[in-house]
Amino acid sequence: MAKRVLIVDDDPAQRRILEGCIKRFGLESKTAASGDQALHILTGPEKDDIALVLLDLVMPGTGGMAVLEQLRGRPGSPPVIVQTAHGSIDGAISAIRAGAIDFVVKPASPERLEVSINSALKLQALSGEITR
């Protein structure tokens, strides 16, 4: 089974763009339109199918930072790459401190996303080897 990336963004156009990129990278995707929907997936029966999360920070309701806070320290949580149109250094630092593995500013180039995703998946695989 191909690795599945959970795309979490309230903007349907952004979700479609990211789905296309993920497919070109040879990965499968699943989408969530809100932080609540993402948490439902990441804590439900599908959680083991998700290898990585691409998470928008600014969404109505449960935002990206709240999702990160709820996932922090949870065993088996996939790596999270956060993305936002508000590329402040403070936002990036806060996201990394909250548990994100990387931070990209929208619109991110497909090349930048691919490097970030591949790095996160490799790091996750190495972490899995260490804990075995």
Identify the role of each PLM range.
Residues 9, 56, 84:
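Active-site residues of response regulator receiver
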Residues 15, 60, 84, 88:
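The feature encodes the CheY-like receiver
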Residues 16-24:
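Charged docking surfaces used in two-component/phosphorelay signaling
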Residues 31-52:
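Acidic, metal-coordinating helix/loop segments flanking the phosphotransfer/catalytic sites
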Residues 34-37, 62-66:
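Acidic catalytic/metal-coordinating carboxylates
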Residues 40-43, 65-76, 94:
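Short amphipathic alpha-helix used as the core "switch/output" element in two-component signaling
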Residues 88-90, 104-118:
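C-terminal output helix
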